[in-house]
Amino acid sequence: MDKRVTKTIILTEGDAEQKRHEILEYFHSTFDIDEKLYETLRHDETFYLRADRLRHPLIFYFGHTATFFINKLNIARIIDRRLNPRFEAMFAVGVDEMSWDDLDERHYDWPTRQEVKAYRNQVRTLVDELIRQLPLTLPIGWDSPFWAIMMGIEHERIHLETSSVLIRQLPLEQVVQLPFWDICPHCGEPPLNRLLPVPAGTVTLGKAKGDPLYGWDNEYGRHEAAVAGFNAAQYLVANREFLEFVEAGGYRERQWWTEEGWQWRQFRQAEHPLFWIESGDNWLLRTMAAEIPLPWNWPVEVNYLEAKAFCNWKSSMTGLPLRLPTEDEWHRLRALCDIPDQPYWVQAPGNINLEKWSSSCPVDLCRCGEFFDIIGNVWQWTETPIYPFHGFDIHPWYDDFSTPTFDGRHNLIKGGSWISTGNEATQAARYAFRRHFMQHAGFRYIESSAPVEIHQDQYETDALASQYCAAHYGDDYFGVANFPLTCARICLELMTGRELGHALDLGCAVGRAAFELARGGFRQVTGLDFSTRFFRLASRMQDEGYLRYALTEEGEIVSFHEVALAELGLTPVRERVAFYQADACNLPEKFTGYDLILAANLIDRLYAPRRFLAGIHERLNPGGLLVLTSPYSWSEEFTKKEEWLGGYREAGEPVWSLDELKKTLTPRFRLLDEPRDLPFVTRETRRKFQHSLAELTVWERQ
């Protein structure tokens, strides 16, 4: 039996004690193979060399995968003790460089290799005991203690791969080639690459919480897309095919590169792929621990920026619209080839999961239908920056696994490489790296005129905008009902027996009341807000059906939230709502003819509230209602003091806002009923809330 070959665990079926045994074996095999990787380092001193100036030395990663278990087990409250607090702080956080020149120049007092190995032994013993003793029930889900165990195992398997890339960047004299990490012996010239058709189709991505396999948070949720037909290269781009770009001077010609790519190329002074070595008239290839004559029929390994430049060059040379595939297009291609998933395959359908070699292999060796290397050999760069699926939820035990990458600057790689194991080798895996990042990664090009859709799904992080998102669509607090929803319901009660034609939500913020008015029966609802931020979010909710936002929990700690119209039962009415940006004190003429105007907590934020009130009757139909709410929290930040309706003294006497409202509106409006108090709560942090009382008044146009 090849000790390198393992499969991730099916967590939903079988006998509990048998599952315990499977997880125990999986844990130890993961620890073993990770330590086997570090045996390729020739000297103890090698552990302290920086293979990549943007990364830590390998001693960090040797300790990191072990401390991860302890840190996550403590967060999950499975254990309440530390083995080595110093190590568990020092090895906790890696380098997440945001640029190729983002150097980490800090000095670290690293422990010895022997000290770290002794610590790893302690962790292994502790986790072994936990696996043997913790209560285990099936299925194993997000809340199970064994999910934390699986999290540690799969995390270590990620670093098995990323550390192998760092070892590959060490000086050759610092590493040793071991038989365990065997190199593919096959090499030669590649076949001519050609484009083959991939018919149009639909892809459905995303896991449900009950999925049988362990997954990282970005895999959950749901995404559906109709994919236009395209032509895809039969093979990954081989070294020989990429050599044409190098020899054509592609690395020196600005026209082929993106702005980001050219800046990287200029900084690194790159002339060819990182792992190519020019040796006189010949080329060598650096594998993980050896140098060999460059196999022309192995896939080239480059970053996204280089792959993109090649596609631009190749497109110009051929006259074809060539580019990298999107994530959806990659899945469409995989579906066409009908490839089984790990752990369900009997034998890997590619050079993946360490089931073939510990290196790349020829691009025409692993057939998948008419194509080759749909999975395995090297990862494949895509055009898609990673984004969260609808229904995405953060796992509380690892709340920063994915969200820092939802920035539009981390592109997805698909398919896995020869050393991708565990979760990395599954179809649902979604790993993304900065575009300059080096990995065992290459690419396949496609021919398509379809535009590349970039999902602008970053979380709203502006504190005020996020507070409004939570106030409109989030939880209730302290028994106080949702304020926009309450306003809408009161308006609908007031409109009983009246015409439900056209309503205006003036100062709509992020739109909840407008949607609720439409649900309540209005045939048309217009939402207006002066703030670009709020208008944009309301429009996004209408157009895309969901919002994502980050709320401050404590200090720099935030929580991430997603709300959807479908969950609120508002999807059927969104076509009856329209949002616009407008100044309430200077409305365009087209905004008129309303049966109801709701101006919730608006007047004390206007720069000219008297002007607003003096002209608002022109926007209402005769008999229409104007509903105002306000806490009358006048501030010169928003309104010059001479424009305040109340909240000041005149001739020594207090002037109240309600009295001024009556004075201003009475000539054209009739006050219906007595004013009433309407409470609302604004969440600032997990432990800080504002409780306010707005006064609600209802006015009927004469």
Outline where the language-model segments fall.
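Conserved beta-strand signature within the Rossmann-like core of class I S-adenosyl-L-methionine
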Residues: G623-P631
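A short glycine-rich, Lys/Arg-flanked "PGG" loop and its adjoining helix->strand segment in the class I
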Residues: R610-P622
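Disulfide-stabilized, aromatic/cysteine-rich ligand-recognition loop
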Residues: D2-H56, G63-T67, I75-L136, W147-P171, ...
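Conserved Class I S-adenosyl-L-methionine
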Residues: E553-E554, T639-P675
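A short acidic, Gly/Pro-enriched loop at the edge of an enzyme's catalytic core
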Residues: C585-I597
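Conserved alpha-helix/loop element of class I SAM-dependent methyltransferases that forms part
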Residues: F478-L500
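S-adenosyl-L-methionine
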Residues: R540-N586
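Functional-site microenvironments in short loops/helix caps that host divalent-cation chemistry
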Residues: G152, E156-I158, L166-H186, P191-G215, ...
